[in-house]
Amino acid sequence: MEIKKKQSTRKRSTARWIVVLLLLAVFLFSLYQTLRILYGYRQAKAVYENAERAYLIPVSRDETEAETERIPPAIDFEALRAVNKDVIGWIFIEGTEVNYPILLGANNQQYLFQSYEKKYTVAGSIFLDYRCGADFEDARTVVYGHNMKNGMMFGKLDRYQKADYLAEHPYVYILLAEGGWKKYRVLGCGQAAIDGETYDLPRSTEDADADRLLTLSTCTNDSRDDVRFVVNCVLEEVGTQNLDH
């Protein structure tokens, strides 16, 4: 009887250790995954902070210039395109994290997880739908970016759901690598089906007076496969000179 009791105790002890080891393994794996994700985010942030330092040309402003009239500095596209000829522009939204080069790949997967430096990054790049023209002259131009949890890329577009945020950040600027710039006014935001009208491209137009629309597209916060979160904008102003002139 005593022997059976010892065997039973030993089995329970072994089972406990197995459970402890399994829980420890799960914890260590979870810790590894968390650290890997955090490192990826930190690395991506550094990539685009370096891009701002390297390719944005600071512009001295008139002291009397109103904050609401501020416009983005010029971009050294010659140096930027020496790194990657797929760079076709730069997107900027005053007072937000959106301040990135725009890429145009052979398809819509090429720059999902590749930076403008052609290196892997969890944040990927901001990129134009491959069916759209690099001159942004289509009836609708779609630009994609990841919905990053740290707010990078298009990670804060959902804030346009709030009226006060829209009022504070009403314009999207596109600086073109071939010269000139475009200023878009934000119309609104919402969800769009991936097989819906928004992504029915290309939509070229020969009507010079027709509205040119810009759609910024990212994943929804719940990562649904059938819809995307979009911010729709309309072209309001076009410039042929650098924005610092």
Regions found by a protein language model. Give the residues of each.
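N-terminal Lys/Arg-rich, disordered targeting/topogenic segments
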Residues: 1-13
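Alpha-helical transmembrane segments
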Residues: 11-28
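Solvent-exposed, non-transmembrane regions of membrane-associated and secreted proteins
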Residues: 27-245
